Amino acid sequence: MSKLIQAHDLADYEDFINQENFAGRPLAEYVSEVQRIYCADKRPWVIGYSGGKDSSAVITLVYLALLGLPPAMRQKDVFLVSSDTLVETPVVVDLIKKTMQRIEAGAKRAGLPITQHAVMPKTHETFWVNLLGKGYPAPTRSFRWCTERMKINPVSDFIKDKVSQFDEVIVVLGSRSSESASRAQVIAKHKIDGTRLARHTTLANAFIYTPIDTWDTEDVWKLLRGAFRYSPDDIDEWENPWGGNNRPLWTLYMDSSAQGECPLVIDDSTPSCGSSRFGCWTCTVVTKDKAMESLIKNGEEWMSPLLKYRDLLAFTTDPVNKDTFRNYKRRTGKVSYQYAKDGEEISAERKHVPGPYWLKYRQQWLKELLVIERDLNAQGHTITLITQPELHAIRQEWLKDPNEPDWYDTLPGIYREVYQQDLDWVVDDQSRFDASDADLLIQIAQGFDVAPEMVMKLIELEVSMEGLSRRQGIFDKLGSILKQDWGSLEEIQQQQAALQKRNDRDIHQEEVTRLEAELQVLQRRIVDASESSVLVEEENERAH
């Protein structure tokens, strides 16, 4: 049996490490491997921590390995990184924050170079700014716009920052082959021969290390349950090496029917959420959020309003409901149509592709979200469902919406109605128009049978160019606005049908012209052949 060689501060854990087997190997071999790879070079480590069982097992393994090293060998930084999407399931995000703080505090006491860092999406890439601000539809399997913006990009930016400081980094993940076969295949494909490392699929100078990739779920829980059987006087059941306790994590899994965790996503090959896992409470990739439903049934009833809100968003993704909640125009200002199917006549009528959510629904949903936030805090749950920077960003998105510019500037009023107070709203320095201007413009536009939104966009363009000595590109911008689809869907479809008929006529005319040209060529060839035949006959007659 393998014995741990480097066991400097592991007196309470040494028997556990030397005697317990994981995936058919002594735990001592895994700890020694971590120590060997850690000491092999000066590349710092970035440990992805999602708060779930697998990432908790990885940080536990690394923590034990570092405890076993003499202080002089603990020279390399270990950055413990979690990704906060700002819409994480509340009980999960609370557990992550507390655990991260305890790990860093325990590491400081033990003299380990571990620091904790939380990354989050940039304000313009958050869930609410995109959904409520820009009107992006709730994510689905076919349009999962959230993963890259909210998870991949923040973690990638952190890794890139460390690469710029240290030239290279090693990213330590809790990926297991039994959890994600596709992820295991990707890592194996990029494996560096003769090492336990793999090249990152997208980030240069970043390398992947998966120390528990062969473990099964029982191995993970065995490590998290701890060494209490070997040191009953010093270590309690579920106690972790930094002085915390893993029982809340176990309880969380039990209360949610062991749904699993949402992994720290670092690239497209990492399985994202959407399969009844812990993750974003707003996730609509699945029909039902079974994890949250189970948590509510097992004592977290206060989260019921969040589940109801999430179910509302999921309802809007049903194909039969899309036309109700979503604009018929895309954010480009144009109506898009489905591509013709194989074998379908080009003249066949095609369905339009819905665009962003109507502004009126975004306004309604923002108010409902703020009411839920207010009520939960009044009940004693300290929670932020939407941040102030997000509210400011959403307001700007509404004011400058490409299809429905919010000249009424409704967001401050919505916030005031819910909270009976104002935020420090930015006053637009470009003479932003107000509700009275919008009312007047709508009234005048109706008399001239033009879309008031088009006139609003034209006026906004003029204001934005006011005072410039060179109004470069203004005609292109004017043309872009005028070429958008303005009017009702029926009017736009009538224009599209007329254009389609004209195109059909053009296509048919082109075909007729082509056939006539070919006919002329054939006729000419027939004439030439006939003339040639006559000449041959005359030559034959003269020869006789």
Regions flagged by a language model, labelled:
Residues 49:
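The Walker A (P-loop) glycine that initiates the GxxxxGKT/S ATP-binding motif of P-loop NTPases
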